[in-house]
């Protein structure tokens, strides 16, 4: 979230950046009204408390005086009781006003950086570069779901029987390919890119989701555990970022770089009718996540290196892709700047997002109380957090299937994955 004082002192800037995202003036107008109400109520409470303090001293003096002076204290005592009752009422009102203000502040998105293009939808994202070439086929390439169903390696029908729509069962080759991709990604990120592998919980509490920005705004996208303050994770970003919630990190320990493989669970609210076939949009999917904690001075460079780490996965797999910079209308709530990597899918004749790499600046750190202590200084500062997919395993799997398909429906294994397919028993 943004700092309360910053919002108050930079209302025009905050409003302008919200407008860039396609938001109306309503949220910031509401903030101004509630904040002014809070300040006026607070001023009234302070005035009454000062009046009570002055009167209390006067009453104490009168009580030490003559009988006549003691009688003069009685109406003052009565008045102070009335003031005390009014202060209690105003304090209750102030607590409610503060709650209302906190809700508004939590609903204000991160400020997009200056170089983020202004636009309304993903159609206005900016293509920055492409890597590799689209594969050429002597036959009409099929979509992954056709390949999987024909080879009996992906079963959507039985998955629907077990769990409903937007689930899949991987079998045989597809299941092994999924595992090979996961191990390849983790090996690359830990052995070459310098990340520490972690295996976090797959259930998180509301405080964790609030810190990373999923709550309260995106509650409908989450799977909640009834009667528990627990939710299935929508991404490993949530538990991994919260490893250092309410902690102060020594500057010499930064940057901290984590990678984690987890299943992810999303309700896909608002996606009715979109990508109903295949593995592109599932309620449950696997992902390798990359998370960084760094200093403000380093976060810009760390975003570029994070993007490079994700890109190398596709480069080693020999998959054609492009990098796009998200426009303001497509930017995530907590992000200040995001690059998407979109892989080419010949069976669908389109690019599909396979990774989002984002810099959150201190937005998540403020919500989660994640700080660092600069070397030689007593006062701590907020860290900057970043994360990205390295990569979404299911989408990488379908990209390999579609790009490496043969005319007979078989799939050629990319060279870099062959060691993971060697039989050991």
UniProtKB/Swiss-Prot annotation:
Ranges in a coiled coil: none
Similarity remark: Belongs to the class-II aminoacyl-tRNA synthetase family. Type-1 seryl-tRNA synthetase subfamily.
Any Gene Ontology CC annotation: cytoplasm
Record EC number: 6.1.1.11
Residues engaged in binding ATP: 266-268, 353-356
Gene Ontology molecular function terms on file: ATP binding; serine-tRNA ligase activity
The protein's name: Serine--tRNA ligase
Keywords: Aminoacyl-tRNA synthetase, ATP-binding, Cytoplasm, Ligase, Nucleotide-binding, Protein biosynthesis
Reaction equation(s) it catalyzes: tRNA(Ser) + L-serine + ATP = L-seryl-tRNA(Ser) + AMP + diphosphate + H(+); tRNA(Sec) + L-serine + ATP = L-seryl-tRNA(Sec) + AMP + diphosphate + H(+)
EC top class named in words: ligase
Description of its domains: Consists of two distinct domains, a catalytic core and a N-terminal extension that is involved in tRNA binding.
Binding site for L-serine: 235-237, 289, 389
Cellular compartment(s): Cytoplasm
Primary localisation category: cytoplasm
Pathway assigned in UniProt: Aminoacyl-tRNA biosynthesis; selenocysteinyl-tRNA(Sec) biosynthesis; L-seryl-tRNA(Sec) from L-serine and tRNA(Sec): step 1/1
Subunit-structure text: Homodimer. The tRNA molecule binds across the dimer.
GO biological processes: selenocysteine biosynthetic process; seryl-tRNA aminoacylation
Matches recorded under PANTHER family: SERINE--TRNA LIGASE (PTHR43697:SF1), SERYL-TRNA SYNTHETASE (PTHR43697)
């Amino acid at each position: 979230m943004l700092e309360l004082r910053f919002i108050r002192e930079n209302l025009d800037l905050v409003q302008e950046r919200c407008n860039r995202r396609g938001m109306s003036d309503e949220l910031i107008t509401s903030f101004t009204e509630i904040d002014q109400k809070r300040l006026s109520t607070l001023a009234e409470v302070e005035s009454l408390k000062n009046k009570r303090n002055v009167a209390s001293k006067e009453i104490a003096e009168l009580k030490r005086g003559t009988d006549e002076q003691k009688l003069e204290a009685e109406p003052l005592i009565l008045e102070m009781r009335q003031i005390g009752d009014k202060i209690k009422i105003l304090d209750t009102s102030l607590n409610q006003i503060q709650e209302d203000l906190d809700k508004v502040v939590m609903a204000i998105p991160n400020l997009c950086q200056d170089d983020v293009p202004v636009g309304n939808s993903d159609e206005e994202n900016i293509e920055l570069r492409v890597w590799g070439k689209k594969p050429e086929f002597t036959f009409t390439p099929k979509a992954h779901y056709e390949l999987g169903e024909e080879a009996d390696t992906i079963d959507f029908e039985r998955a629907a029987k077990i769990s409903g729509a937007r689930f899949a069962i991987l079998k045989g080759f597809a299941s092994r390919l999924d595992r090979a991709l996961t191990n390849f990604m983790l090996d690359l990120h830990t052995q070459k890119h310098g990340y520490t592998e972690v295996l976090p919980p797959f259930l998180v509490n509301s405080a964790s989701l609030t810190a990373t920005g999923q709550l309260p705004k995106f509650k409908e996208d989450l799977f909640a555990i009834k009667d528990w303050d627990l939710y299935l994770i929508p991404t490993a970003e949530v538990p991994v970022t919260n490893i250092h919630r309410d902690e102060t990190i020594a500057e010499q320990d930064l940057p901290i770089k984590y990678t984690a493989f987890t299943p992810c669970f999303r309700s896909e609210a608002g996606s009715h009718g979109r990508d109903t076939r295949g593995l592109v949009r599932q309620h449950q999917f696997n992902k390798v996540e990359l998370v960084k904690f760094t200093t403000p001075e380093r976060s810009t460079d760390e975003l570029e290196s994070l993007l490079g780490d994700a890109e190398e996965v596709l480069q080693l797999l020999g998959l054609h892709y492009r990098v796009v910079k998200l426009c303001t209308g497509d930017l995530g709530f907590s992000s200040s700047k995001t690059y998407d990597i979109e892989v080419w899918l010949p069976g669908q004749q389109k690019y599909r997002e396979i990774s989002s790499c984002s810099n959150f600046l201190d937005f998540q750190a403020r919500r989660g109380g994640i700080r660092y202590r600069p070397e030689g200084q007593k006062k701590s500062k907020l860290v900057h957090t970043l994360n990205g997919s390295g990569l979404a395993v299911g989408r990488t799997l379908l990209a390999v299937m579609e790009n490496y398909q043969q005319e007979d429906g078989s799939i050629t294994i990319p060279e870099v994955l062959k060691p993971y397919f060697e039989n050991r028993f």
